A protein has these predicted regions:
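Pre-P-loop entry segment of helicase/translocase ATPase cores
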Residues: 1-26
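Residue-level preference for the first positions of well-ordered beta-strands
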Residues: 27-29, 58-60, 107, 128, ...
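Conserved P-loop
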Residues: 27-90
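Conserved beta-strand scaffold positions in the cores of enzyme catalytic domains, especially
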Residues: 61, 109, 184-186
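Inter-Walker segment of RecA-like/P-loop motor cores
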Residues: 75-125
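SF2 helicase catalytic motif II
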Residues: 127-137
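ASCE P-loop NTPase helicase motor core
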Residues: 136-206
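ATPase catalytic-site recognition across NTP-hydrolyzing enzymes
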Residues: 192-245
């Protein structure tokens, strides 16, 4: 993909923290369709905000696994930040150091795979955290990472694709964004100016039903009707009497 200029929604993600009406917010939530440009604009915005606001502080960048985080985000950051910052990744320590002039900050990488993952982030003091694909992480991990943000001025940055409307993140953060003093931005594929129109049309033709609503429209919708389209009542429904067989 050849990166083009940023869309208005991406620019809002990059610079929201500079706007007087948003400077006192506790963070940013971006959700929406696949391939909508959330990840690139949020990663750049997070680094820009942290480097402009802090020096010699620790931050966390979290994904479902460190491997997925590296593949989807970290490996691209030197290119995305080229000409702005010097980026040094220390793979053996699962961290990267970003520098500009005499100012530098450290960004630790964490994976929130399961309920035990919260123990990995205990103890560290953070000035901010970015959650990439937060809906794939357990609540215990997310809340433990947020609890580490005790530095004055720290903020939370979340992005995700939609899941069920019963998902804890949707109920506790997206529906309560204003109550929690968060800025909420919803993305669609039209917000990604780098996405070719033919590719966009292909994605739109790949899905239907609940998956179209989630992946293309970026909506938190619940599955209805048959989950398995190959279902056959005569073949798959077992008579009650069969359940008594030993």
């Amino acid at each position: 993909m050849q990166y083009q200029s940023f869309s208005p929604r991406q620019n809002a993600t990059l610079f929201w923290w500079t706007k007087p009406e948003h400077q006192n917010r506790d963070g940013l939530i971006c959700d929406g369709s696949i391939r909508s440009g959330k990840t690139v604009s949020m990663a750049i915005g997070f680094i820009m905000w942290s480097m402009a606001s802090f020096d010699k502080q620790n931050f966390a960048i979290c994904g479902r696994t460190i491997e997925a985080l590296r593949r989807n985000v970290i490996v691209h950051i030197p290119t995305w930040l080229e000409g702005m910052f010097e980026v040094t990744e220390r793979r053996s320590e699962n961290k990267m150091v970003v520098t500009i002039g005499n100012r530098s900050n450290t960004y630790y990488l964490f994976g929130g795979r399961d309920e035990s993952s919260y123990t990995l982030i205990q103890g560290i003091t953070l000035a901010g955290v970015l959650f990439d694909e937060v809906a794939l992480m357990p609540r215990s991990f997310v809340e433990q990472a947020m609890a580490r943000c005790s530095v004055s001025g720290s903020k939370f940055w979340f992005n995700c694709n939609p899941e069920s409307p019963g998902h804890w993140f949707y109920k506790e953060w997206i529906r309560k964004a204003a109550e929690r003093n968060m800025l909420y931005l919803h993305f669609t594929m039209d917000d990604n100016l780098s996405l070719d129109e033919k590719i966009k049309a292909r994605y739109e033709g790949m899905y239907s039903g609940v998956f179209y609503d989630r992946y293309i429209r970026g909506l938190w919708t619940v599955a209805e009707g048959l989950i398995y389209t190959m279902f056959n009542k005569d073949y798959h429904v077992v008579p009650v009497s069969y359940t008594h067989l030993r």
